[in-house]
Each structure stands twice: as structure tokens, then as C-alpha cells.
Amino acid sequence: MSIRIVPKDQLGKQSEKGTTAGNIPPLLFANLKSLYTRRTERLQQLALDNPLADYLDFAAKITQAQQKALHDHPLVLDMQAELAQSAASGKPPLDLSVFPRTDHWRKLLSALIAELRHDAPDHIVAVLDNLDKASVHELELYADALLNREFAQIGSEKAPFIWAALSLYWAQMASQIPGKARAEYGEHRQFCPVCGSIPVSSVVHIGTQNGLRYLHCNLCESEWHVVRIKCSNCEQTRDLNYWSLDTELAAVKAESCGDCGTYLKILYQEKDPMVEAVADDLASLILDAKMEGEGFARSSINPFLFPGE
């Protein structure tokens, strides 16, 4: 099954009923009113007893700055034309490979830089100063490199700040998409149906979506449904295994696939209702080291941890 977003005016009564498969919502948009606040709180909580405490606190400062930038720099767009075009082409409406960026993302970056400068250590201030002095052309090249996963083209010290601005920009746009999501037969469920990016991790929900697994986009923050008995990367079902650092009851596990040799974190709200897709993934890097030691490659990217040059 693949997921496609359809404009509301193209949904008749019959197709409206068909926007979910077995009453399963195929797509969940982020609640921006609480997303960054919740992520900040979770990062701060996880930092209390973690060998990566300093970096988790650093990430929390970035998410706090994202929350402020979201409030200070709202974005209002008419997404009808983009949605109609994407529905006709079968492409994600905010396809990161072709969607024309405006200067709004650079305004967000400037706001993040200004906010983070206040109490940042000297080595971070130096990075922020370099970004602040960069030309529009340079910043757009950095953005292109990150979105195209050409990480050698941008220093890993700059990447989290550029991505934080891009992600907030894409999340703001995604929150204004007026269509409905519909599950259809097809492939490529490893990519976000909203923007075409990849997941940071997956979350097994409680509440209304109890027991359902959703992949969380590392760019636009949307979540899309993928069944739990299928590899989120290659869609095979033959050789899936689950790994944890603690016990079988651990809230954070890694789902590995013997077919494609990759793994993705899977977070269980039933075990810990406070798990958060980005924060808990970042705080469990020891599990990543274990998976790499077992010969598996990570199929996702955390927005605070990009591959080095």
C-alpha cells in the first residue's frame, strides 16, 4: 500500500469513506502547537541520566528556538494548486527534490541563529557566525546538499542548524495542506508521502491509533502508517528481528531486516507514553552502535546527527 494526498474537492462521498484502510488513518500531520515543546521537554528529561547529556541539552536548545521561530514567523500559503498538481502527478505535494523554496526558510534560520547565540559556547557561536555571514547562494547550496543527502558538501557542524530551519519551514507548509490522505496499492512506503524525505524512527501509538506503527518524517514531521510485520525500508517480511539494550519490555528497540541489511528504531508508547520520535532516537545511540556491530546499516537520519564529511 502507498499513501496519496488528494484535494478535498476530488473526494466524493464514496472516496471519502475510502480515505482509510480498515479505518486506519494513513497519515497524521504534526500538531505544531505542541510538537517542539514536547520534544524539548523529552530531550531535557532524557539528558538527566544519559552519557550524551550535553548533546541532548544542545538539541533541546535548538527545539526551543524552533518553537520561538514558529511563533514569531508564521507562514500562510495557499496549497490548493500544489496539492492538485501533486495529485495528478502522483508526487508528494511538498516533494523536497523539486518544491521551490522561498526565502522564508532563511528567515527562520536567521531567527534560530539570533536566539541560539545568547548562551551558546564559543565553538557554537563561531558556527552560527559563519552561517550568519554566508551569502544567499551559499545557504541555498547548503540546503540543496542536505536535502539531496550530499553530506560531504556541508560540514556536519552546520547541518543541524540548516536542517532545523528547513524542517520548520516544511512543517509549517505541511500543516496547511487542505487535502485528505488515501491509502492505495503501491510501493515506496519508506518515503514520506508529504515531502518525500525519510523517517527518523517509527512509533507504535496508544490511544486512537492504539497498536499502529507510524514512521515519523525527519523533515516535515508528518507520520505515515506502515504495518508492523514489514520492513520499513524494503517492505520484505521474511527476516525481521528486534533488538534492545535492556529487556523485551524496552520502550526503544531496533527493527532489523536480514533482506536489505538495515534497521530502524521502533518506539513503543505502551511501554513509555512519553517516547518522542526524534528525542528517544537521539538518546539511544548506544543501540545504534550495537546494530552497526551486528552488521546492520541505519536506514534513517536524525535531524541532530548527520553523517560527517
UniProtKB/Swiss-Prot annotation:
One Pfam family in the UniProt entry: FdhE_N
Keyword list, A-Z: Cytoplasm
Matches recorded under InterPro entries: FdhE-like_sf (IPR024064), FdhE_C (IPR056796), FdhE_central (IPR056797), FdhE_N (IPR056774), Formate_DH_accessory (IPR006452)
CDD domains in alphabetical order: FdhE
Coiled coil: none
Primary subcellular site in the record, as a coarse category: cytoplasm
Cellular localization per UniProt: Cytoplasm
GO MF term set: ferric iron binding
Family to which the UniProt record says this protein belongs: Belongs to the FdhE family.
Function, as annotated: Necessary for formate dehydrogenase activity.
Protein name: Protein FdhE homolog
